[in-house]
Curated annotation (Swiss-Prot):
The gene is rnhB. SUPFAM superfamilies: Ribonuclease H-like. Endonuclease that specifically degrades the RNA of RNA-DNA hybrids. This is Ribonuclease HII. It comes from Methanocorpusculum labreanum (strain ATCC 43576 / DSM 4855 / Z). Pfam families: RNase_HII.
Length: 212
């Protein structure tokens, strides 16, 4: 029997892509022996180390959705995320699937993912599955490290952008200054996010020339 876990990183940030990753195993106990856990509970160095071991030892599949993809989506962000999970499930063809549900209704999320994927796999869709099941924890690590590397590339291109989250003052400062000086939204930003709309609204009210 094959088992896959699926999780995403970067659903909420205003900058950078959303990454959805899956890990396919035949025995979850091998992952458990590595001490796999939710990526958020690991140091960056430990995540990187486990990422290398996971991607070397097991089959993985990653879906990258850019800010443009996210802004162009039809429907809710939860539906968009379910479609990304479905892409991973379809690619890995597991007998049993563990999902970290992002919908308030975890069962509904699992049903939607299976329907979109066309898979006949058994599914376990739960909140905080990355902290409960090693295979989802492994997927969480792959997704998080992949996104962290994308953010590092963006920092090389744009300079200091912070973490990319709307709550990060460094991210807000970057967006505000970029829009003030360039008169446009950077390609790394999600235009449909309220954070960007608020900055654009302030810019239009004050005039870009004297904005901030």
């Amino acid at each position: 029997m094959t088992i896959c876990g699926v999780d995403e990183a970067g659903k909420g940030p205003v900058l950078g892509p959303m990454i959805t990753a899956g890990v396919l195993v035949s025995d979850m106990s091998e992952l458990e022996m590595l001490g796999i856990k939710d990526s958020k509970k690991l140091s960056p160095k430990k995540r990187e180390s486990l990422f290398e071991e996971i991607t070397f030892s097991w089959k993985t599949y990653t879906v990258v959705r850019t800010p443009f993809d996210i802004d162009s989506r039809e429907g809710t962000m939860n539906a968009f995320t379910a479609s990304c999970h479905a892409d991973v499930v379809r690619a890995l063809c597991a007998d049993f699937v563990y999902l970290d549900a992002c919908d308030v209704n975890a069962k509904r999320f699992g049903e939607n993912v299976l329907r979109l994927s066309g898979s006949s796999a058994h599914v376990c869709s739960e909140h905080k599955a990355d902290a409960k099941y090693a295979v989802v924890g492994a997927a969480s690590i792959v997704a998080k490290v992949t996104r962290d590397r994308c953010i590092a590339d963006l920092k090389e291109e744009y300079g200091e952008i912070g973490s990319g989250y709307p709550s990060d003052p460094a991210t807000i400062s970057f967006l505000t200054e970029y829009i003030r000086t360039r008169g446009e939204v950077p390609l790394c930003a999600r235009r449909s996010w309220q954070t960007v709309q608020d900055i654009l609204d302030r810019a239009s009210q004050t005039g870009l020339s004297d904005f901030f």
